[in-house]
């Protein structure tokens, strides 16, 4: 398996430090609002990477943090007239609602910055002892120039970074590129006791300390959005490697932006859409499928039209699964035939292409294309007139579900309660048609259509599918 490493700017063969376990840290949300689809992209992409690593047999220790204290949190809490903790609790709960809808597995650990203050203070003390940090009236800064490899992730010198960076102007800093590790308390802000007086941690040190606490000094994979390369991830490397004297992360993975009308989506630009809002029109799974339809490092354009295309694509897969479920119930033959064995071998060949795509820097676009190739083969060879065996139907069903599971899609099955209700309505419609009560038959068809049920007459009887 090869992954593109931002640190080396090339694809490299991935082997974890421990041959059986992968240690992975992914930057989570700042919990002051519902997350938008720009935030959702890394959550979905790196959940998919985790799923694939687990599929390959690794135990993945996956840590995703919650930033639950920073300037945005304090500002929003003051606007709402609630505490920062109440705000964080609310939006952490809302995160899990949206994440569950998107099929994002819970992390092994979801640490909150405010619950790891001791670990953060310990790391800052270590940096101070080693001469990488200095205290100015209760504010503690990291000396960027003392870390000689600063800039190695963004592949720029300190001078270049200084010219192009948005830097907090603070005359008390020894160098403009120095950044805050600890911020002295301001009136009305939450604060914790520390050797430098009451205050709160800086953003960058939170991730370094939590990764160190839960995964150790050197981890296999650190991931996040492209916008985090500098300064956040650059600063994490500086802090962690200065404190521990060891490489922090062996692989750095970053996803591309989501654009709206050619511009990066961002809360600051006001051109963002929350996942919660989009899910009112499109199913959460459609959003996930949309994200996986492009290579994760490429920019992706957002539009309702593209979401509609994703919906149609996902529906093709589900219709194939529904068809297989239906044929399985009515299959007469048990044993696989020679021609079906040939089909099985062709499907296994396509599965190999799926694996090849995922092994090539998690190329989910090509992996989805492989699933569509399987769907095409199945639809052509296993249908109402093919008299297919239960064995080949079961094999095809399992294969689509297996590969879909790697991507976190196509795992839903028709609800049994819904099945019963629909079957009863279809039976009533059939009875009405026999009695030439066309009015009732049409009314039932219309009702089913409103429920998103499409009817199809087949030699085995009426077949129905859910329009998702």
Swiss-Prot record:
Pfam families, alphabetically?
Answer: CysS_C, DALR_2, tRNA-synt_1e
Task: Please report, in chain numbering, the residue ranges of the motif 'KMSKS' region.
Answer: 264-268
Enzyme Commission number: 6.1.1.16
According to its record, what are the GO cellular component terms? cytosol
Short motif ('HIGH' region): ranges: 29-39
| Compartment(s) | Cytoplasm
Give the cofactor binding note: Binds 1 zinc ion per subunit.
User: Required co-factor?
Assistant: Zn(2+)
Q: Which SUPFAM superfamilies match?
A: Anticodon-binding domain of a subclass of class I aminoacyl-tRNA synthetases, Nucleotidylyl transferase
Residues binding Zn(2+): 27, 207, 232, 236
Q: How does it assemble?
A: Monomer.
Record NCBIfam families: cysS
Name assigned to this protein: Cysteine--tRNA ligase
Give the gene symbol. cysS
